[in-house]
Amino acid sequence: MAERPLDVIHKSLDKEVLVILKRGAEYRGKLIGYDIHLNVVLADAQLIENGEPKKSYGKIVIRGDNVLAISPVEIE
């Protein structure tokens, strides 16, 4: 049986994710919360530009309307 999108997000709780926004901004951090509207809460969030951290934040909330994609980050 195929996984549903929210199942993948749920499995990513307390793990590092990359959130890509509609206007192209990217944030990486530990996913500590989400809801059915894809509002997400990241801890230890970083704004990513050109693949590199540009600015660090503590905890941030990203409104689901702005989210284009949420991807688990593979830690090597």
From Swiss-Prot:
One of its GO terms (molecular function) is RNA binding. GO terms for cellular component: ribonucleoprotein complex; Sm-like protein family complex. Keywords: Ribonucleoprotein. Residues 4-76 form the Sm domain. It holds the Pfam family LSM. GO terms for biological process: mRNA splicing, via spliceosome. Belongs to the snRNP Sm proteins family. PANTHER family: SMALL NUCLEAR RIBONUCLEOPROTEIN F, SMALL NUCLEAR RIBONUCLEOPROTEIN F SNRNP-F. This is Putative snRNP Sm-like protein. It comes from Thermococcus sibiricus (strain DSM 12597 / MM 739). The lineage of its organism: Archaea, Methanobacteriati, Methanobacteriota, Thermococci, Thermococcales.
